[in-house]
Amino acid sequence: MKKIRIAARGSKLSRIQVRMVEEKLNKLGIETSFVEVKTKADLFQASPLSQLGKGVFEKEVNQAVINGEADIAVHSMKDMLSETPPGLELYAVLKRDPPFDVLISLSYRGLFELESGKVIGTSSMRRKNSIVFYRKDLLVRDLRGNIDTRLRKLFQGEYDAIIVAEASITRLATYDHQYQGINYSKFDPTLLTPEANQGIIAIVGKSNSPLKDLFRKLNDEKTYHEAIAERTALNIIGGGCHSPLGVLFEELDEGEYRGIMTFIDGKKKITVEGIFRGKPEKVGGELGKRLLKEIKDEGIVIET
């Protein structure tokens, strides 16, 4: 078999995620090559993500596959649009890494230990709104850049604390010893519900490619079910990766899920949770509809 060409962004974390896919393919005796792609998010790092539109981490990477420059695209699934572009489909997801958000600080052990007036960095609307909801006395400053850049800004004293995905830290630490031993405080999902599909690496390719069956071998079924349930719930409300919504499903047993979904806008927080049974699309739809009803009852309109 020819080498599999893998398209992805060129950031340190993205290269690590490609490496995780490559290792699985190499175990099957398949060689790979890397195709680096610059995305809109890479080119406009000074701009807030909310101003760049949707799909800023994935469009150009997917286009490389559509153009025949690569065989597959590897993404952090939380950055993907809710609908896969025409001609492409989700081939597989790797086993989920921790889905939670974490706070990293050199001086403080958690959000509620930060002194009034301290500066906390994040580029996520969901995280910003959560900080304002719980700690209006903190200064929230936009934080763009790859995860290693964000950590460097923290260590250089530009921020007193930052909030990032736990998965990004664990992946960095696994493949680069300089990131081992970073202490962080993990958020319980009832306090800060993660973004949909956080901690999941997705593999996307052409719908008509014969490679599709090969990548099915890499698919983690439990993670796939959780991913579909979360995306379904998000689609019910119409939110994207820049919306103030968090959702997390855990498949407890085949067809049984624990789910939680939260809307938070800095002034109001609405959370629904429970145990659900059925296929991923069904349980995701149920949770999404429950939250949507409560949002509408409060007279809140979410921008899509």
What are these regions (language model features)?
Residues 83, 130, 172:
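Glycine/Thr-rich phosphate-binding loops of Rossmann-like dinucleotide-binding domains
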Residues 2-38, 43-46, 50-52, 133, ...:
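Small-molecule-sensing regulatory modules
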Residues 5-7, 73, 91, 121, ...:
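Short, well-ordered beta-strand segments
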Residues 55, 69-76, 160-165:
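Paired acidic/hydrophobic, glycine-rich loop segments that form the ligand-binding mouth/hinge
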